């Protein structure tokens, strides 16, 4: 089971704080923006004498309300198509365990969310990665590259759209390319779409559920964690029109009894958040994105493409090893009593040696803190003993 590149340096950050150093957390996608007040009010006003099990598939009222939410994105599903899970992570794990046998293979563009590997190991499956590069903005390679990986063990393709960790948004051409592969080889398409609210380029959001001809192959993964700053209530969803897959998933849901009761109450109420809540959150991320990307690309030797969605970017640094650099920032460096914590990007790749000069950065801090973190990062790079000379 691999370590999490997002969390494995947390003890070093805790030790730095204990010494009085302020740590700017750029490593983890924990939004700092407020949870919708309607969700908090629902939690505050829970008036129950018993906190009972909920149905294993989740409350019907919540699933019905979700269908209206998805219609806003032209995703037409019924309450029966939706299974509520304990976060998007459980949805991914249950999808793998329901659709894959030990030894089956999943094709995933890399870099990819690191926990996918852990879930695949739990399901006895194997991940085959297809390379995307920072130089190409993390766009997908040609279809022939996918077909080179497809064999008798291949059962699925997984995408995250918009992407974590890169912020890349798949184009219509790329989504059609994936559809054609799924249809040609009769594969499952696992599509993690938890960042659909956060698209910044004017390009269309194309859900896997929009792709014609593969409706029975698509398993959509969703979560309220990033949409409503509700990571702690652990509510996600697995959505598919494939009744056989739903039946298999329900066996796992029944074995784990029920998704979180209180979390469902908060999540259902949060669907009534006013439009200005979504607008204000979106506009804040637009501003933060510009602040971060402009600031990164002004630092000598640093390069980041412009992320099109989500609230992450992968940046290339002029360092010998980004994990060593991230550790050094926490253990040996501070600038005026402050330092930065980032996620070494090698942990988002399975190909050995790739991503060693890259980091994932989450722009989940207010603009003033991002500006200060960029100053601290610049000073850290100037002082780091393992800095590499690049053409600047």
Regions found by a protein language model. Give the residues of each.
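PLP-dependent class I/II
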Residues: 2, 9, 16-24, 28-46, ...
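Generic structural signal for well-ordered alpha-helical scaffold segments
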Residues: 14, 67, 71, 96-97
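Basic nucleic-acid-binding alpha-helical/helix-turn surface characteristic of O6-alkylguanine DNA
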Residues: 49
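Conserved N-terminal alpha-helix of the aminotransferase class I/II PLP-enzyme fold
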Residues: 53-86
């Amino acid at each position: 089971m691999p370590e999490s590149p997002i969390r494995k340096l947390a003890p070093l950050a805790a030790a730095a704080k204990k010494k009085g150093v302020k740590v700017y957390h750029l490593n983890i996608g924990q939004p700092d923006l407020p949870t919708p007040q309607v969700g908090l009010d629902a939690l505050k006003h829970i008036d129950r004498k018993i906190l009972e099990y909920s149905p294993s598939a989740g409350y019907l009222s919540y699933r019905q309300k979700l269908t209206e939410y998805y219609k806003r994105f032209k995703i037409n599903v019924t309450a029966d198509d939706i299974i509520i899970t304990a976060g998007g992570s459980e949805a991914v794990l249950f999808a793998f365990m329901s659709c894959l046998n030990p030894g089956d293979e999943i094709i995933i563009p890399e870099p990819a969310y690191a926990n996918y590997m852990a879930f695949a190991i739990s399901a006895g499956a194997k991940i085959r990665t297809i390379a995307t590069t920072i130089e190409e903005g993390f766009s997908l390679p040609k279809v022939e590259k996918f077909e080179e990986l497809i064999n008798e063990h291949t059962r699925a393709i997984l995408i995250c759209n918009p992407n974590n960790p890169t912020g890349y948004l798949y184009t219509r051409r790329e989504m059609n390319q994936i559809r054609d592969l799924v249809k040609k080889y009769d594969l499952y398409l696992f599509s993690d779409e938890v960042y659909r609210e956060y698209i910044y380029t004017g390009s269309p959001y194309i859900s896997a559920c929009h792709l014609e001809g593969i409706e029975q192959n698509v398993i959509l993964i969703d979560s309220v964690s990033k949409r409503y700053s509700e990571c702690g209530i652990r509510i996600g969803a697995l959505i598919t029109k494939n009744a056989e897959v739903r039946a298999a998933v329900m066996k796992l849901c029944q074995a784990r009894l029920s998704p979180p009761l209180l979390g469902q109450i908060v999540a259902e109420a949060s669907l009534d958040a006013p439009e200005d809540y979504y607008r204000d959150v979106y506009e804040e991320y637009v501003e933060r994105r510009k602040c971060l990307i402009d600031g990164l690309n002004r630092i000598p030797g640093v390069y980041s493409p412009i992320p099109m969605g989500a609230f992450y970017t992968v940046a290339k640094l002029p360092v010998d090893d980004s994990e060593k650099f991230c550790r050094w920032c926490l253990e040996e460096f501070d600038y005026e009593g402050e330092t930065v914590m980032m996620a070494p990007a090698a942990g988002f790749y399975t190909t050995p040696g790739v991503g060693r000069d890259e980091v994932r950065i989450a722009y989940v801090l207010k603009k003033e803190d991002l500006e200060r973190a960029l100053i601290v990062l610049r000073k850290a790079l100037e002082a780091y003993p393992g800095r590499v000379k690049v053409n600047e």
